[in-house]
Amino acid sequence: LALLPASKTLAQTNAQVFYDFGSDRKFVTLTLEMFKQDKWGNTYFFVDHDFNYDKMDTSSPNVAQGGTYTEISRALNFWQNSPMKNWSLHVEYNGGITKNYPINNAWLFGVEYFMHDKSFKNTLTLQALYKTIRKTDQNVPMQFTAVWGCKDIFGLKGLNFSGFADFWWENHVSML
C-alpha cells in the first residue's frame, strides 16, 4: 500500500486465476485486486474466491473448503508536503464467508511508513496495526505487515516482484 505522487488518479485492477496443486487443496482460486491512489492517500482491496464446493468433504484435510475472503484498506495522508510525508494513517477491514467454518470479521487501525527509490520502481511499505477480530480472544491484538514491489528486475522490462507478509497473533479453535 504505497503513497505515490497524486499527479494523476489511476486505478490498477487485475484478476488472477490460480490452481492450487497441494495434496490438501487441488482447486481453483480467483483473485481480484485493485489499488488506487488519490490526493489523500490510497485505497486497496482484494477478493479471493475458492471454487471447490463440489469437492466438499468434512473429513478431508482440505484447508479451505470453498468460500470467499476479502480485505479492503484505506491509507490517509493529508500532509504529503511536510517532513511527515512518508507516514499515513491506516484503516482496514478483513472478512469472508465459507460453507463449513466461520471467518471472523476483523478491523485494523494504525500507521504505515512508505519508502521508495527515486524512480518509484522499488517500493516498501511497513505497517503497525491494532487488530480486533470478532469473537476472538487475543493476547497481542497487533498485526505487522510489509508490502513490496520491484519493477523491471535485472533490467528486464516487465519482470516484476511484488508481495506482502502479515504477522499477527490469534488464539482460536477451529471446529468443522
Feature roles, as predicted:
Residues 8-12, 37-44, 77-88, 116-124, ...:
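Short loop/turn motifs that connect adjacent beta-strands in outer-membrane beta-barrel proteins
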Residues 9-55:
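Short glycine/proline- and aromatic-enriched beta-strand/turn motifs that initiate or cap beta-hairpins
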Residues 11, 26-30, 64-70, 103-109, ...:
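Residues that define the transmembrane beta-barrel architecture of outer-membrane proteins
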Residues 17-19, 45-49, 89-95, 124-130, ...:
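Transmembrane beta-barrel strands of outer-membrane/channel proteins
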Residues 21-23, 53-57, 80, 95-101, ...:
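Gram-negative outer-membrane beta-barrel proteins
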Residues 32-36, 72-78, 109-115, 128, ...:
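Residues on the lipid-exposed face of transmembrane beta-strands in outer-membrane beta-barrel proteins
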Residues 59-111:
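Hydrophobic/aromatic-rich structural module bridging two neighboring secondary-structure elements via a short loop
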Residues 129-176:
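Outer-membrane beta-barrel transmembrane domain signature
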